[in-house]
Amino acid sequence: VAIRPLRVGELAEVLAVDFDDSEGIPRLNADWRWEDQEQALLIACSSLIAIVEPGDGNSDVESGKSRVVQFSHFSVKEFLTSSRLSNASGEVSAYRIDSENAHTILAQACLGSLLQTHDEIDGNTSKDHPLAEYAARHWTIHAQFGEVSSRLQKGMESLFDVGKPHFKAWLTLYDIDIRPPFISTFSAFIPYNKSSAAPLYYAAFCGFHDLVEHLILNYPEDVNADGGYYKRPLIAALAGEHFQTADLLRHNGANPHVRGDQESTPLHSAAYFGKLEVVQKLIEYDADINARDEYEWTPLCWSSRGVHFKDGSVLRLLLERGANVNARADDDGCTPLHRASRFGALEAVRLLLEHGADVEAVSYHNMTALQVVGKSNPKAGQGRCAEIRRLLIEFGAK
């Protein structure tokens, strides 16, 4: 389940983790480290593994830096992960690899490594803490698998404790907020904010619900603290589509009304990218459905552009919830119908017309929707553009 092939030193470090600490926090035990790491791994895994030079196809493992560990044959992995193995008789069933347990062990090992690092990150960090680089980049991915995070609560609470140096050290090694592992839902509108974000922001961003609850209890002032790529913990939770966590933040006073550089709101962005569930949540949180950005564009304007237009569900929802179907943009005087026509979004045009869009509205350039069909989307195709023109004429365009 490793995100990339593990180097010998990284996997050997896992053998030095005490998973049975009395406080429930994984800890590295320096006395458990082997001087001959390859021998340690071969003793533990025998012929199930092979230690090889890193392959050229994996850019995340630099050639010549360290040998990597892999299964000796693809059939070994198939056998160890097979459901049939769990039903086998005798001790052999204990060797079955369960994905959730494997992610749990790797996440715990990563936490154990990060909890040994401090804020003095330098060139010796990788040497002194072989697993630290991998841990900083990937531990959250392992922790997000299934119910893994619920098994890591004590370790995560320790890592996210602002009174200790580990949290800062982790972000110094690799800041997941700078290179988000999730699809960037709001990046086009909410600007990157280099100011440091509170631990609550990162917990929300990753969707660690129990950890968010713990941090709200201990640091309630951070619920609306500014900082980070998405500016607020609530918006970070929505960007990762962690809706239960977002509800928890909202219930504890999180304010969804934030603005980007161009005065755009999260609703503008969610509408543009066609994120239906995010749009639903923002409306539930009383977001202004007719909010205008710097150019007087509303969320409906962005939704109707068609670049990320899917099945019309977002546009339909906005219209049903009272979005102004004829809202004009300040920069060019175009309405949502102009946008949808210009980008060749047939279903958007149909929905807007059915909800009363002014088919004869004229932009500041003296153009109607009929005159701009397909102008901004060469891929729209002649057939679709012809259908849009037919539809506009059917609704009264001249």
Locations of the language-model features?
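Leucine/isoleucine-rich amphipathic helices and adjacent mixed helix/strand linkers
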Residues: 1-225, 232-251
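Alpha-solenoid repeat scaffolds
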Residues: 120, 149, 222-223, 256, ...
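Ankyrin-repeat boundary/"N-cap" motif
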Residues: 191-200, 226-234, 259-265, 292-298, ...
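Ankyrin repeat A-helix N-terminal signature
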Residues: 202-207, 236-242, 269-275, 302-311, ...
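Conserved ankyrin/ankyrin-like repeat signature
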Residues: 211, 244-245, 278, 313-314, ...
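Ankyrin repeat domain, specifically the short helix-to-loop turn at the C-terminus of the second helix
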Residues: 214-222, 247-255, 280-288, 316-324, ...
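"… SH3/SAM/PH, and C2H2 zinc fingers" -> "… SH3/SAM/PH, FHA domains, and C2H2 zinc fingers"
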Residues: 223, 239, 257, 264, ...
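Ankyrin-repeat-protein effector appendages
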Residues: 355, 374-398
